[in-house]
Amino acid sequence: MLLFGLLVAGVADGCDLVPRHLRGRRASGSAGAAASPSAAAAGERQALLTDPCMSLSPPCFTEEDRFSLEALQTIHKQMDDDKDGGIEVDESDEFIREDMKYKDATNKHSHLHREDKHITVEDLWKQWKTSEVHNWTLEDTLQWLIEFVELPQYEKNFRDNNVKGTTLPRIAVHETSFMISQLKISDRSHRQKLQLKALDVVLFGPLTRPPHNWMKDFILTISIVIGVGGCWFAYTQNKTSKEHVAKMMKDLESLQTAEQSLMDLQERLEKAQEENRTVAVEKQNLERKMMDEINYAKEEACRLRELREGAECELSRRQYAEQELEQVRMALKKAEKEFELRSSWSVPDALQKWLQLTHEVEVQYYNIKRQNAEMQLAIAKDEAEKIKKKRSTVFGTLHVAHSSSLDEVDHKILEAKKALSELTTCLRERLFRWQQIEKICGFQIAHNSGLPSLTSSLYSDHSWVVMPRVSIPPYPIAGGVDDLDEDTPPIVPQFPGTVAKPAGSLARSSSLCRSRRSIVPSSPQSQRAQLPAHAPLAAHPRHPHHPQHPQHSLPSPDPDILSVSSCPALYRNEEEEEAIYFTAEKQWEVPDTASECDSLNSSSGRKPSPPSSLEMYQTLSSRKISRDELSLEDSSRGESPVTADVSRGSPECVGLTETKSMIFSPASRVYNGILEKSCSMHQLSSGIPVPHPRHTSCSSAGNDSKPVQEASNVSRVSSIPHDLCHNGEKSKKPSKIKSLFKKKSK
């Protein structure tokens, strides 16, 4: 087509068909040569000048070029708003943005104008003739229709009408007759879309696709994979964190339930203490009222006695005597009832204070446990609140999911829950135990004057350094006495002891319930001191020439109070020191009876202690007790040695001697950095109570001497020869403390 146009242009030049600016020159030059042209040639030249196709460069000769020129003229009119024959930059920009609906028209605008700021129809025609779209074939047009316009359903219509690149200007101006009748595009939206696409390629050239960038595709694929993986990981971590948080909330709820139960128990404890105080006040009122009635009965009896003495008539005296007797009987019945109430639990008055002191010390330990449990609870709540605050943000959720804080908080919550459950169990057990003790004893323990008052009243007679239990916990020492030989100071203090109760007080006591602290093994010297006058002194051949040193036994009332004694130590020779052995019979590990520290260290895996002599005596029946009394009475009348009394005693008495013959191993403890050793040192107490039947009637006055005899018999049974205590121990090796005591005596 281009070659054909050039040939036509050359023929036109040969036929004097030249442009207007050359045509004027040629006409002026040929005016003198040809003065009279023919009329036919002049008419033909005038027709060429009036035809617009011939006035353009390159000219148009075909019908398609004429249709294209008309379409371009229509487009030029649409773009030329001011009708000045040229398209300015503003007009083209407005047309591109409003009519063609392009938002970013920079590239299109520069491609249309290039260097020309004023575009005429001739410029538009030249641009179209030199465009690549003008030379499109049918296949190129169909490819443009399918790929860019995306209307493949009209491919057959384009092929039937042989739509090529030269036909696109007609489509660009939306020629209705051509698009509907020939191309058969009835859909208005399709016609509008096809018009815009055709106008785009006519004005701006063919659309070009950028080269396919495989690197971008690879990066995009990797990004998609990473994004999907990250979303899946975040989903799983969020799900896991939600499960952890749900579990943690469940633990918190259980923790709150335990805390509420603890508060309820504390309220019950306060109510019980208030009831105990009320009961104590009522009891005091009843006792006061009873004493008033008894005093009134006594006064009435005295008045009747005076009336009987002052009466002259024997009958009146008898009546007065009967009335007095009746009053005395009533007073006696009341006194017997009161005596039964008071004698049902015949314990020393100091026991109530000691039990109150024990209760207060236990309450202090409970308060420490409670403070620790509350501290653990507060820490767990703070950690849970921190995790809740962190989960409010996206990065906080990821941080919580990746870190181990959830496991740590879960562990802390479980520890706090465990501590609260242990505290609740301890509180219930303590309440029940002290209620049972108060019920059995019959006096108040939980309601007392306080720990300072009890301590000052109980330890006022001794020069002891009182240290509270709560401030410094005990530190148990692993190992036995042999491990402490190198750390033991060369001087072992001997504590002053309390004198055992006389036999009369033992006889009047009707209860066998005594504190374990009062049962302290007595020394052989104290046994010999309590022997009767007829007892042979040859029972101790190993100490013939040494004076009898009185030994004192001191029951430690408090295992955590360090006692400092000013009593001088006892001096023994080498023969006496050889008799000191620290052994234990069979598998029993007997703790020190003067210390209660074993109860604090019971979790270290110690074996249970053997039964004491008091527990042995409590298991006796009433018939065995009566048989023991008879045997002890018979032995007290005879002149046989002490060994005969032991042989004639009951098997329970033999068990008692075997129990008393055991040598207790010392229990070593470290308290506040100071080593405190409490050694038994053969300090066996002779004040073991012997059970005897309690007499409820006061009429039998002839039995007053019997308890005295029984007490003396008990002292005789307890004073067993020293050799019998060591028959089973001569083959055992002494410990290292023996050598230490030898060095001290030297």
Curated annotation (Swiss-Prot):
Residues carrying covalently attached carbohydrate according to the record: 135
InterPro entries found in the cross-reference section: SAM, SAM/pointed_sf, SOAR, STIM, STIM2_SAM
GO molecular function: calcium channel regulator activity; calcium ion binding; store-operated calcium channel activity
Name of the protein described by the UniProt record: Stromal interaction molecule 2
Example of a GO cellular component annotation carried by this entry: endoplasmic reticulum membrane
Species: Mus musculus (Mouse)
Function, in words: Plays a role in mediating store-operated Ca(2+) entry (SOCE), a Ca(2+) influx following depletion of intracellular Ca(2+) stores. Functions as a highly sensitive Ca(2+) sensor in the endoplasmic reticulum which activates both store-operated and store-independent Ca(2+)-influx. Regulates basal cytosolic and endoplasmic reticulum Ca(2+) concentrations. Upon mild variations of the endoplasmic reticulum Ca(2+) concentration, translocates from the endoplasmic reticulum to the plasma membrane where it probably activates the Ca(2+) release-activated Ca(2+) (CRAC) channels ORAI1, ORAI2 and ORAI3.
Sequence intervals crossing the membrane: 219-235
Native organism taxonomy: Eukaryota, Metazoa, Chordata, Craniata, Vertebrata
Region spans: Disordered: 490-562, 592-651, 684-746
Superkingdom of origin: Eukaryota
